[in-house]
Amino acid sequence: MIIVTNTAKITKGNGHKLIDRFNKVGQVETMPGFLGLEVLLTQNTVDYDEVTISTRWNAKEDFQGWTKSPAFKAAHSHQGGMPDYILDNKISYYDVKVVRMPMAAAQ
């Protein structure tokens, strides 16, 4: 399993604009190898909002299949370029080495 994050610096007070874009079912949920998505808002930032989109995939090839799909291209075709509230962003890839799950409650 891999996790891919896209961490964006957003003009202060506008983090909700990016968060709202992900608060609906999209095409990524139908992609082979897609395991889930979380949208994270960093607490206690002073000068800007920081939003991280974290996606989980069976393999890097599955993520690459998503990025080459027509659905991805349509979702990321920002007319006029990147939205002006996004100051910067960084993509990171993580190999998942350990997964721990909660223990079932004792009966």
Swiss-Prot record:
Heme binds at residue 76. It catalyses: heme b + 3 reduced [NADPH--hemoprotein reductase] + 3 O2 = biliverdin IXalpha + CO + Fe(2+) + 3 oxidized [NADPH--hemoprotein reductase] + 3 H2O + H(+). InterPro entries: ABM_dom, Dimeric_a/b-barrel, Heme-degrading_MO, IsdG. It is an enzyme of class 1 (oxidoreductase). Fe cation binds at residue 6. One of its GO terms (molecular function) is iron ion binding. GO terms for biological process: heme catabolic process; iron import into cell. Its EC number is 1.14.14.18. PROSITE patterns: ABM. Induction: Up-regulated under iron-starved conditions. GO terms for cellular component: cytoplasm. The keyword Zinc does not apply. The record marks 66 as: Transition state stabilizer. The keyword Ligase does not apply. Allows bacterial pathogens to use the host heme as an iron source. Catalyzes the oxidative degradation of the heme macrocyclic porphyrin ring to the biliverdin in the presence of a suitable electron donor such as ascorbate or NADPH--cytochrome P450 reductase, with subsequent release of free iron. Homodimer. Belongs to the antibiotic biosynthesis monooxygenase family. Heme-degrading monooxygenase IsdG subfamily. This is Heme-degrading monooxygenase. It comes from Bacillus anthracis. The lineage of its organism: Bacteria, Bacillati, Bacillota, Bacilli, Bacillales.
